[in-house]
Amino acid sequence: MFIVFYLILIIFIFIYFHVYINLKIKSNSILRKFKSEVDKTIIEINQATDRNINIIEIKIESLNRIIKEVDERIEILDQRLLGFNNSSIPGNSPSSFGSKSDGIYKSNLDYSMPTIEKNIIKESYNVRNQIILLHEQGMSFEAIAKKFKLDLGEVELIISIHRGGVHEKMDRY
């Protein structure tokens, strides 16, 4: 009788440990899945951060080029101003001012918009026009924001600026 009791006890202990070990294995697999998801999320965050850092570095380089270009233009204008002041000194004829070197100044003084951001400006202008057109067709702010992957506030700002500009133009007439 004791042998049967011990045999039944051993079987229950075996079943208990078998179930216990299976639960541990399942919880470990859940933990592994959770850890892999967290690792993937961290990798995605790192990639987004790297992308943002690269964008910021490109903007910094762009601004440095613009600053360099502006400094060169300031230096050219200073030289031109100095040349103008020197031409007003007696002995220098005003007609000779700029005759030889004016071509250099004119070629260096290009008063156009910096070429670095032209495409970005055109692209943002097209997006702005598309947003205004979609809003005028009755699309909601949320749908427009989702379509262009913009914040809701940005879309509302673009529309409100457009409305303000239209009302100002109408008030003038």
From Swiss-Prot:
InterPro entries: DUF6115
Top-rank taxon, per record: Bacteria
Localisation per UniProt entry: Membrane
Membrane topology: Single-pass membrane protein
Residues annotated as transmembrane: 1-21
UniProtKB keywords: Membrane, Transmembrane, Transmembrane helix
Signal peptide extent: none
Keyword Transmembrane helix part of the UniProt annotation: yes
Any single GO CC term annotated in Swiss-Prot or TrEMBL for this entry: membrane
Family named by the database record: To T.pallidum TP0711.
Protein name as catalogued: Uncharacterized protein BB_0265
